[in-house]
Regions:
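Intrinsic-disorder/coil detector with helix-boundary
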Residues: 1-192
Length: 192
């Protein structure tokens, strides 16, 4: 698709699982400044136990995106309006826009011990887990020039634990899309 359409921007929106319910809430938006596949590497067996040895190969978005997100994250009025305009079920928390590392994997995680293991073994600063961002970043990074600028904007719909529910999926999808809309209208450069 990148080869055929040669987009200037490649943006992914959607939902993700947060890693820390004490620092983020349902619907909070996470911009993946860095992403990698948390299962990349190799599995080895040593005596009586198996171990996964990670090979972390992250992709990072352009600095301009990071600066735009930092600026928008301070715009409490815009974030409040995004939340207030949603007509469905939503949490009673203030919407936040976060940015940082997000990891991708091939399966849905509903086990907080897996999340704790990823945070311990790879980076305690990972904000979210999901299944697609790394693939998008990989494709954009290795595209034939001109490469698109790429960014993923996902919102927290659960915390990858046994309490996984769908109550806030619509709200999370909405906040993700609305933050993208705000960035696209107010920050993206369309001069070709």
């Amino acid at each position: 698709m990148i080869y055929n359409f040669v987009p200037r921007y490649l943006v992914m929106t959607g939902i993700a699982a947060g890693t820390d319910s004490g620092k983020m809430n349902y619907g909070d938006v996470v911009v993946a400044t860095t992403a990698w596949d948390y299962r990349a590497g190799k599995d080895v067996r040593e005596e009586e136990r198996s171990e996964h040895i990670n090979t972390i190969k992250p992709f990072t978005i352009e600095t301009s995106f990071i600066n735009w997100v930092r600026e928008l994250s301070k715009d409490e009025e815009s974030l409040r309006k995004i939340s207030d305009d949603f007509q469905g079920k939503k949490p009673e928390t203030k919407l936040k826009l976060l940015h940082g590392s997000v990891v991708s994997g091939a399966s849905v995680v509903t086990d907080e011990e897996i999340v704790k293991g990823i945070l311990k073994e790879q980076s305690r600063d990972i904000l979210a887990l999901e299944m697609e961002i790394y693939g998008v970043y990989y494709a954009a990074n290795w595209a034939i020039k001109p490469r698109p600028k790429f960014v993923a904007i996902k919102s927290i719909s659960d915390f990858a634990d046994a309490h996984k529910m769908d109550d806030f999926h619509q709200y999370a999808s909405y906040t993700s899309a609305k933050v993208f809309e705000k960035l696209a209208k107010d920050y993206f450069d369309y001069d070709f």
